[in-house]
Every structure is written in C-alpha cells, then in structure tokens.
Amino acid sequence: MASTENPDPETGKSEPIPASATTPPPSAASFLDCRKIDVIIRVLLFSATLTALIVMVTSDQTEKTQLPGVSSPAPVSAEFNDSPAFIFFVVALVVTSFYALMSTLVSISLLLKPEFTARVSVYLASLDMVMLGILASATGTAGGVAYIALKGNKEVGWNKICNVYDKFCRYIATSLALSLFATLLLLVLSICSALSKRTP
C-alpha cells in the first residue's frame, strides 16, 4: 500500500500529506445526475400539461335543460370556450406543454454537450419562471370560474351548473388538478435553478 506520508530530509521523519492533496477531483457523476433529474421533471411537466389540455378540450357535455320562455327542455351544451377564463387556461396549457417539450429536448442535448450548460441553463431558468407565472395565473383564474360553476353565487344570480353538467365539471376539475401539479413542477425547476447558481 502506498504511503500517505513524505519523509522530511532534515529530520528524517515522515510528514502526513494534506487531505486535500489526496482527495480526487469531483467527478462529473453528480452533474449528470442533476441533468437527469432535470430531464425527468421536464418529461413529467410535458405529460401533465398535455394530459390536462386533452382533458380540458374534451370536456364538452350536452344536456336537456329548461330554458326561460321555452315550453319543453332543449339541448344545451357546456363547453370550455363558453368562458374566457377557460380559453385563457387552454392557451396557457398549449404554451406550457410546447415549452415543456422543447425544454426537455434541450435538457437532453445538454447531457450530450455539457459545455453549453452554463449559458443555456440561464435561459431555461428564466423561461421556467415565465411559464410558472403564466400557468399559475391561468390555473387560478380557471379555478375561480370552476368554483362558481360548482357552488354558484346567489347574490349575483349565478346558478351552479355542476349538478347538471357533471361530466363537464369532473373533466375541468381533473384538468385543474393536473395543471396545479405542473405548476408545482415548474416551481421545483425554478428553485433548483436558483440553488444551483448559489452552489460554488
């Protein structure tokens, strides 16, 4: 076994080699692990936003309801494009889903070409925060309208509709839950980016 001590030419005694001199340089394994985790989170983000988008645009439901001035019930459809808040929500899901796909491909490419990581990571971190703001605001806005659809508002004469359009409301609730999960993933990505910048 190789000795970790150097003999002193004056005293003839061995002196211990500093620990820093025997410690191997940090490997790239930890860096690759971080990039792999980043890719996994972005894949989850894409899956969540795409699923939320599909569920939202397929939430249409038609039921026969009694309309004022009409003697017999008439078929009335409930669609996401009936509400500007839901339209904004769908647009936000489209944008975020597309961004998640593109950023996943970029993150995978950084595994193959790590020399571009520092510069590209700055752009990804900034865009992550932008997407976080867009998706969070859209989710909150759509959630407010969904709550009125569920509970109604007697003070302003807004009736609840979820007792009639149950499938429509279930789909919206599922889409909102997936969007909230995607928002949390974007928050995790933003926090990880901030912590990685502070790490020496």
Swiss-Prot record:
Keyword Transmembrane helix in record: yes
Q: Which domain of life is it from?
A: Eukaryota
What are the subcellular locations of this protein?
Answer: Cell membrane
Q: What membrane topology does the annotation report for this chain?
A: Multi-pass membrane protein
Which sequence ranges are listed under topological domain Extracellular?
Answer: 58-85, 151-171
In residue numbers, the region (Disordered) covers 1-26
What keywords are annotated for this sequence in UniProt?
Cell membrane, Membrane, Transmembrane, Transmembrane helix
| Chief location | membrane
The keyword Zinc is assigned to this record = no
Q: Which GO terms describe its cellular component?
A: plasma membrane
Give the residue spans that cross the bilayer: 37-57, 86-106, 130-150, 172-192
Q: Which InterPro entries match?
A: CASP/CASPL, CASP_dom, CASPL
* Residue ranges that the Swiss-Prot or TrEMBL entry lists as coiled coil: none
Question: Membrane side Cytoplasmic: which residues?
Answer: 1-36, 107-129, 193-200
UniProt subunit comment: Homodimer and heterodimers.
| NCBIfam families attached to this UniProt entry | A_tha_TIGR01569 (TIGR01569)
The entry's family comment says: Belongs to the Casparian strip membrane proteins (CASP) family.
User: What's this protein's name?
Assistant: CASP-like protein 1D2
According to its UniProt entry, this protein's organism is Arabidopsis lyrata subsp. lyrata
